[in-house]
Amino acid sequence: FTDDGGSFMELARLDRGVASALPGFECRQVNYSEMDPGVIKAFHIHRRQTDVWFVPPDDKMLVVLLDVRAGSKSPNAQRRLILGDGHSRLLRIPPGVAHGVKNLGRSRGRIIYLVDFQFSADPDQTEEGRLPWDFAGADVWDVARG
């Protein structure tokens, strides 16, 4: 899949994918996405699906997380993180936490992500929900200076 801001592809669907570094997480699908500089992809939300994201150290992505879970102990909490930027780490995004990303780099940014549900276009089975990119305010995507 390709759009004005980049591309997305499914790399693999798995029947069993248990990683010792991710307790309680069984990978069912591996995805790869590229984003052009300055592009924002937001907000996605999943009812049951957990995402695990990896951004290569050579890239720099601003990730915004919003807790919109019903009955959450941290309702409407917002968190901004930088992934990549010389560091290697995984980000685990639980169900019900809206998430989006902005490529802060000068070249195409890459995300490899694992999910514990396989994509389905069937409206009764899909895990793909959306909120507007500016749901938390357009300024959430501004780069903090200082």
Predicted regions and their residues:
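Beta-rich strand-turn-strand
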Residues: 86-92, 97-105
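Non-catalytic, conserved peripheral segments adjacent to functional cores
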Residues: 1-86, 104-146
